[in-house]
Amino acid sequence: MILIGMYDSPFVRRVGIALRLYGIAYEHRAWSVFGDAMKIMAYNPLVRVPTLVLDDGEALIDSAAILDALDEMVGPERAMTPRSGATRRAALKTCALAAGIADKAVSLVYERHVHERANPAWIERCAGQITRVMNQLEIARAAQTTRFWHGDTIGHGDVMVSCAVTFMRDALAGDMDLSPWQALKRHTDMCEDLPEFRETYMTFKIG
């Protein structure tokens, strides 16, 4: 397998962490959507990362779809998403909320540092969305008594939350105060201390 994309993307990183947690060997091609667009285009016409190329040449796109495929590959006993019912729905919601704030954080970075003129209304909108979701995730995590979000084994929600919060720490340093969300901080610190997280950490840089 080939994982395309740089680990400073929370979406590429969540896939890299899942592959490591599953013990699936892969080649990592740290291509940038800016500097390596033509290379990525050969596998993904959207020129987006992550892209995961399977051994038979099939290219999977979108991190959620990639994780769904990986869950299927390893089987229901090892899958990092619960099989069914309310627990599954809750886990998928955690993933969706965390992916949403990561997406909004990326939008903020582009608005502040890539666009020639920042749009204050758009910045306010994105920051408000992030704050509301972080508040909801904080309440949910603080209510959990288990080591991980939905039990004693790590799930995709744990990974996505940690990747999103770490990205915001790095990319939005000075722009957002993360101190109100102490349960999320503890969760992220715990996850980031795991080898699979350390091995995929990349300091975020513009350009």
Segments from the language model and where they lie:
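GST-like domain detector, emphasizing the conserved glutathione-binding G-site
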Residues: 1-121
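Short polybasic/polar patches that bind polyanions
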Residues: 20, 170, 193
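Glycine-rich, flexible loop/turn motifs
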Residues: 36-39, 76-77, 118, 144-145, ...
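Aromatic-glycine hotspot motif
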Residues: 52, 64, 129-133, 137-138, ...
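Non-transmembrane alpha-helical segments in soluble domains
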Residues: 67, 71, 92-95, 134, ...
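Short, hydrophobic secondary-structure boundary micro-motifs
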Residues: 78-83, 107, 147-151, 177, ...
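GST-like fold's C-terminal all-alpha helical module
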Residues: 98-187
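Long hydrophobic alpha-helical segments typical of transmembrane helices together
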Residues: 178-207
